[in-house]
């Protein structure tokens, strides 16, 4: 999008087309909400540390930790929604990447969602997997019916189109990076809900272990973001 091939290299033809294409818009919104999530969680972590060590500013940082919890929850919801729509776009624009994210080797209709898998790139299948039936098709098509193309078929298509070569990404890395990202997101929502509830009920100081844990948990959004960039 927004480029032409000239003398064996890509040259930009339209900056506007480049910055407004669907792929960029999907990633921009996903990244924006990830930033909001990170900011909210960092505010919670810093506020927890201040609540433990600065008793004179207790009211201010109680309000701050509630605001951080709200920011985190809003951010994660935005990440999930933008990620969902971007996933559906990837099914058309970058099906190999999508199939690798889910370790889906064969084209299936409906396609299951693998909760856990041990991908074997040499043999082109999963040596072990635990799946949820229909779930991957629902993610891609918003329906229990719909084909999702698998890695092996996409590899054959790529060879026919571009010539011999291995066009598969590192399936194991993509598969588990995606799950680490998603798992971190849901973990942050859970922590935020607990923090907000306790702060709202004025019971935050009865959960000292949580306050002590929060500064250490500040790494979670950065782990999620790093895994997201790998994906």
Positions of the model-derived regions?
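Polytopic transmembrane helical bundles with strong interfacial aromatic enrichment
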Residues: 1-231
């Amino acid at each position: 999008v927004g480029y032409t091939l000239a003398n064996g290299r890509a040259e930009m033809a339209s900056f506007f087309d480049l910055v407004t294409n669907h792929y960029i818009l999907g990633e921009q919104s996903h990244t924006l909400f990830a930033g909001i999530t990170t900011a909210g969680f960092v505010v919670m972590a810093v506020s927890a540390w201040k609540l433990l060590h600065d008793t004179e500013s207790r009211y201010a940082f109680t309000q701050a930790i509630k605001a951080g919890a709200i920011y985190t929850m809003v951010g994660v919801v935005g990440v999930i929604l933008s990620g969902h729509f971007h996933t559906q776009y990837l099914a058309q624009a970058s099906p190999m990447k999508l199939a690798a994210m889910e370790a889906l080797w064969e084209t299936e209709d409906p396609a299951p969602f693998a909760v856990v898998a041990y991908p074997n790139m040499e043999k082109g299948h999963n040596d072990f997997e635990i799946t949820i039936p229909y779930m991957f098709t629902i993610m891609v098509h918003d329906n229990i019916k719909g084909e999702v193309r698998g890695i092996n078929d996409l590899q054959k298509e790529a060879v026919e189109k571009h010539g011999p070569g291995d066009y598969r990404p590192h399936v194991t890395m993509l598969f588990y990076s995606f799950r680490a990202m998603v798992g971190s997101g849901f973990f942050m929502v859970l922590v935020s809900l607990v923090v907000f509830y306790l702060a709202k009920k004025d019971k935050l100081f009865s959960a000292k272990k949580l306050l002590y844990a929060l500064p250490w948990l500040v790494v979670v959004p950065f782990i999620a973001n790093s895994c997201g960039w790998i994906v």
